[in-house]
Amino acid sequence: MCGILALMLADPHQQACPEIYEGLYSLQHRGQDAAGIVTAGNKGRLYQCKGSGMVADVFSQHQLRQLVGSMGIGHLRYPTAGSCAHSEAQPFYVNSPYGLVLGHNGNLINGPELRRFLDTEAHRHVNTGSDSELLLNIFAYELQRLDKFRINENDIFEALRNVYDRVNGGYACVAMIAGLGVLGFRDPNGIRPLVIGERDTPEGKDYMLASESVVLTQFGYRTFRDIRPGECVFIRRSNREDILAGFRGPRLFSRQILPCLRFTPDIFEYVYFARPDSVIDGLSVYQSRLNMGEKLAHTIMKRFGPDYMEKIDAVIPVPDSARTSALALAQTAQLPYVEAFIKNRYIGRTFIMPGQQIRRKSVRRKLNVQPQEFFDKNVLIVDDSIVRGTTSREIVQMARESGAKNVYLASCAPMITHPHVYGIDLADCKDLIAYGKTEDEVAEAISADGVIYQTLEDLLDSCRTAELTEFEVGLFTGEYTTGASKEYLVHLEQMRIANNRARKHSFAEDEEREAPEDISLHNTHSDVTFDFV
């Protein structure tokens, strides 16, 4: 899972970089492994800065000042099953044709097939194991096949039609063509989210594309909508013909490249990944989590029986993503709600940290307890999900160390028994704590007195609207929207093993080693001075 963002300002003399930079801060929860920004100057030159780490670590004020131009794209990487190399920081760039950059959120399930095609037929070199580089080169190949000196919006849509025919998976992308404009597109099942907004200015309309609506509202984009599954939007920089025709500012073009196939957004966005103040595909993430808490409350009351209030002294959330659901659960069941875990806000989200050992250590760094809220009490701890069990074991142990009599754990999500194939590095089946186990066996594995899972039907009901009736739930059922062959799942596991092996070297003796310098063209990590054009 990653965060993506694209911006086109109406005023060609304004700089897009500051807003992209701040926007990435708002999406930081979507990826903490690497960050990158690429902008385009008015004469078409691209300026890039990217590297490993969080937004605050990657960009200095000196580097930001060199990212000039009124349009650009940004990316935050979440470590998936691919390599952890510094070279895989996005956006990716190819010079031919036209100068293209692309940032991608998701996963392609026919990656090995695409890699062979690019090698044997398209004769394009792919330098990393990233699906994003595959997508970029497929797009570049299809544009190259048009064999045009200059392209327009119709050419872009035609090329993307062929891209859709070749790739399979869940993806949302933003891209930029040097000197021409920015675009965004989404897979035909709508698995990964993408939203577009517009903002009125004296020079015309500014446009922004982002993974979540929270970025748009932060910057005053009052009119926004979700990109439809299979749709592409292209925002062209204003040119001389536009000015002569009386148009002001960038021009927006939209086309439904493919008809929507099923419209199955990934339900894990609502469970965990997205910010609660975002709206995805018309559904408030906050409201969906309230619904999850209410549904889970009824399951718990049924599980514990009529005297459940005598068996549970306090409902305690695991901050932050479980807070909303835990509060709704407590209110529905008329149980005391207590903030007994105190979060260190300077530690990243443990779920998306690269490596099991790092996650385990980070739980204790991230959370501390209020002992008086546990001592001599029966506590119900509410978490958004239970994946590997790393966090769950630690928080149960912390509760017991603080004197809790009985510790029960409730999950807002059902049992996760299968890998996620669309860009979230959950784990292989054998590493998922619920794989092949009952609720009682999971409770024993994490040393809890009981574990209560949300039912799949209740989770679906929590997120359904008039427009949203189906969701991607393969991690619970093993049935994926696009299908996933056994060969691909084996390939995914092999990539994850190689990735974990690389990370063991990277984090030897608990110290993160400095990554090699990125020597990509125009990378502002150096002290080279660029022309501000």
UniProtKB/Swiss-Prot annotation:
Cofactor list: Mg(2+)
What is the enzyme's main class?
transferase
Q: Which domain of life is it from?
A: Eukaryota
Post-translational modification Phosphoserine, affected residues: 506
Q: What is its EC number?
A: 2.4.2.14
Q: How is the cofactor bound?
A: Binds 1 Mg(2+) ion per subunit.
State what protein this is by name.
Amidophosphoribosyltransferase
Sorted alphabetically, which SUPFAM superfamilies does this protein's record hold? N-terminal nucleophile aminohydrolases (Ntn hydrolases) (SSF56235), PRTase-like (SSF53271)
High-level lineage:
Eukaryota, Fungi, Dikarya, Ascomycota, Taphrinomycotina
- State the similarity comment: In the C-terminal section; belongs to the purine/pyrimidine phosphoribosyltransferase family.
GO cellular component terms, semicolon-separated: cytoplasm
Pfam families xref list? GATase_7
Q: Does the keyword Transferase apply?
A: yes
Pathway noted in the entry = Purine metabolism; IMP biosynthesis via de novo pathway; N(1)-(5-phospho-D-ribosyl)glycinamide from 5-phospho-alpha-D-ribose 1-diphosphate: step 1/2
Q: Which Gene3D superfamilies match?
A: 3.40.50.2020, Glutamine Phosphoribosylpyrophosphate, subunit 1, domain 1
InterPro entries in UniProt: GATase_2_dom, Ntn_hydrolases_N, PRibTrfase_dom, PRTase-like, PurF, PurF_N
**Keyword field:** Glutamine amidotransferase, Glycosyltransferase, Magnesium, Metal-binding, Phosphoprotein, Purine biosynthesis, Transferase
Q: Name one GO biological process term.
A: purine nucleotide biosynthetic process
Q: Where is the Glutamine amidotransferase type-2 domain?
A: 2-238
NCBIfam families the record matches:
purF
What chemistry does it catalyse, as a reaction equation? 5-phospho-beta-D-ribosylamine + L-glutamate + diphosphate = 5-phospho-alpha-D-ribose 1-diphosphate + L-glutamine + H2O
The answer to keyword Transferase applying to this record is: yes
Identify a single GO molecular function assigned to this protein: amidophosphoribosyltransferase activity
